[in-house]
Each structure stands twice: as C-alpha cells, then as structure tokens.
Design a protein with these regions (language model features):
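Short coil-to-beta-strand transition motifs
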Residues: 25-32, 58-61
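Residues that act as N-cap/strand-start positions at coil-to-secondary-structure junctions
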Residues: 16-18, 32, 54
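A short, Trp-centered hydrophobic/proline-enriched beta-strand micro-motif
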Residues: 18-26
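Basic/aromatic-rich interaction segments and small domains that mediate binding to polyanionic partners
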Residues: 39-57
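Short beta-strand-centered aromatic/proline hotspots
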Residues: 31-40
Length: 72
C-alpha cells in the first residue's frame, strides 16, 4: 500500500481511539487484530495491535500492508 487516503487514515485513527478491530492483509495473510496505537519509527508509520484471542502484540508498518479495513 503506497499511502492511505485521508478517509482511510481518519478511519484508522478512529479505530485506534475506540480500540476497534482491524482486518489487515499483508503478504497474502489476513490478520484480525485490535488497534492500540499509531507510532512513528523514523520516517515510517506503524500500527501497534494485539491479537483478540491470545493478547499477543503485533506491529504492522503501514508501507508493508496491502489493505486495512476497520470492523465497526
């Protein structure tokens, strides 16, 4: 994913604020996770998430993600 549109970024920020679930596709794998925070790592943005069943922390760099969908 090259960049998020303003609408997609607003949806992502809202999901983080509410602690909503996200469906993230990266390298052919689908992840359903709970959004926790948006972070900057140098010039790259990443999404800090947790797995809803195990509680394992997962980090996703936005520039490595194929698609992001907010589950309302």
């Amino acid at each position: 994913m090259a960049r998020l549109t303003p609408v997609e970024y607003d949806a992502l920020e809202g999901a983080v604020a509410r602690g909503s679930r996200l469906v993230i596709h990266r390298r052919g794998t689908e992840y359903v996770v709970v959004a926790k925070s948006l972070l900057l790592d140098g010039a790259r943005e990443r999404i800090a998430t947790v797995h809803p069943s195990t509680g394992d922390a997962l980090l996703f760099y936005i520039d490595e993600v194929d698609s992001i969908q907010v589950i309302e």
